[in-house]
Each structure stands twice: as C-alpha cells, then as structure tokens.
C-alpha cells in the first residue's frame, strides 16, 4: 500500500545480473548516504533521530526493532496492560526466579527500548497512542491481520494522523491470501514452508529445526524493509505500508533446495546427520 509493486517475473539465472550489479557498484562512488532520520552529530549512531512506535509482541516482531534500537533509533514499545507479552515467561530467568520481570528472553528482545503499558479500552490511552503516532516515523505491529483495524489503528486511520508514516505489519502468513488469518509461532510456519520435511531421519517422522525457526529469520527482513522505506520516504516524502510474511521471508533459506527441485528435478529428503556435499560426515562413537 502506498507504493507501486514491482511486476512479477521469473527468478534470475545464475550470474545473469552480475555484470549489471558490478557496473552499478563501481559507478556509485564512495559518497556516504545521508541518515534516514534527523541529522545526528558525527559521534551519534547511524539511526539516531529515527522514531519508532512498536506494537509488536513475542519474538519475531520485537527482535527487529531491537536491532534498530541498537543502531540508535528511539523505540517506544507499547504493551497491553491486560495481556502481557507471552515471552515474559520465557527462560532463562534471573537468579532462577520465575516472574514477569525476570525473563531474560523478554529483556534481551526489548533492550534499548522505552516501555509503556496501555489499556486501549480507555479513551485516554487511545489519545496517548495517537500522540505517539504523530511523533513516530515508523509504526510496527505483529498481530493477526485485521487486529489493528478492529482497534481503530489500521494504516489508513494512522495515515490521516501522520501522512508520511511508514508502517510495518508482520505476521505468520502475511496480510492477504487464503492463509492470512492462520496465526501462530515460528515453529508452525517452519513446518508449513517445508523445513520440517527436510530435517530429521528418512525412516522417521519429520523433526524440524530447533526452535521457532522463522522467528529468528524474519526480523532481519523486517529491519531491512523499514530502512528501505525510510530511505524512500527521504527521497519522495511518501509513507508506505509494508506487509512482511514471516513464512515467505524464511523461504530464502530454502533457495538451494528449491533450485535443486526446479532446475534438476531433485527430490530433497531427510538424511539425518549425513551431508550431501561432505564426507565423511556424521556422528560416530569414539
């Protein structure tokens, strides 16, 4: 929304654009780009002056804004006063004391941010949100598609308050399409995308990669998309609504297997601890 999507076309062949990329790189010169936020002093971090309102929760969303905060962006994280973030219960815990303020995973994911708890059922809390939207360069959310609209904070509504707003919506399967309302955590999207089918032993059920795999992949794409949108706004003055499917982002890490299927008609299967390229490779008694 807010920009013209690129027309769909086939994937590039190996080396097809190498000469073009090298020519563009050589012609780019050594000039450093201007910062995307307010002009910082020379000692400031590169994203100093960028202001982000963060409605995200769990891991895949907040990890993206944590990266931007580490590079100097000012991030205000809004959490529900009635439904705390579930990763507050994530291990490990400080001094092995279980509690909403002792979970290391939550604090690691939200370091370098300002935190604010609001009850959006209260009119005064909604006014606080709108004030923050006016302040922000970027609004981020990671709810099931439609949740922000039901709260009255969809992109079109927020754009009326802040016309140049960049908004990122990231969810398991994206904002549109037949699976868009399928909500869950990264282990579910890893299974849907195909990581589980390729991980494990050939004579057993699929086991999948450790953890909620796409939760660790998608934040990098989210952070890059936000930076690209800010650069575009600097050049054009226009905001944009970014739609990031965490499942689609993770497909990039299946690219070798997908190319093997489409180009070589291969049938990737689970191979335990073996490696298709290296030998000997495996776990052996010593």
Residue ranges with predicted function:
Residues 264-286:
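Alpha-helical interface/anchor segments and their boundary "cap" residues
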Residues 9-241, 270:
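N-terminal helix-loop segment corresponding to the beta1-alpha1 unit
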């Amino acid at each position: 929304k807010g920009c013209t999507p690129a027309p769909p076309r086939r994937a590039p062949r190996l080396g097809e654009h190498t000469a073009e990329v090298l020519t563009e790189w050589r012609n780019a010169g050594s000039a450093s780009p201007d910062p995307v936020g307010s002009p910082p002093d020379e000692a400031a971090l590169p994203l100093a002056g960028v202001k982000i309102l963060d409605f995200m929760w769990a891991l895949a969303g907040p990890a993206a804004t944590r990266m931007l905060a580490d590079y100097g962006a000012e991030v205000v994280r809004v959490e529900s006063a009635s439904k705390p973030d579930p990763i507050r219960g994530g291990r490990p815990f400080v001094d092995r004391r279980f509690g909403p303020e002792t979970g290391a995973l939550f604090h690691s994911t939200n370091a370098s941010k300002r935190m604010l708890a609001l009850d959006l059922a209260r009119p005064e809390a909604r006014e606080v949100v709108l004030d923050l939207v006016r302040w922000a360069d970027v609004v981020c959310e990671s709810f099931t598609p439609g949740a922000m609209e039901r709260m009255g904070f969809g992109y079109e509504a927020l754009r009326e308050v802040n016309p140049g707003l960049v908004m990122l919506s990231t969810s398991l399967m994206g904002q549109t399409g037949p699976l868009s309302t399928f909500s869950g955590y990264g282990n579910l999207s890893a299974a849907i995308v195909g990581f589980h089918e390729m991980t494990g032993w050939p004579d057993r059920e699929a086991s999948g990669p450790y953890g909620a795999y796409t939760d660790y992949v998608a934040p990098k794409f989210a952070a890059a998309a936000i930076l690209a949108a800010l650069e575009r706004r600097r050049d054009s003055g226009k905001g944009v609504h970014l739609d990031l499917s965490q499942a689609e982002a993770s497909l990039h890490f299946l690219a070798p297997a997908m190319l093997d299927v489409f180009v070589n008609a291969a049938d990737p299967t689970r191979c335990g601890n073996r490696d298709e390229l290296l030998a000997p490779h495996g776990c052996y008694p010593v």
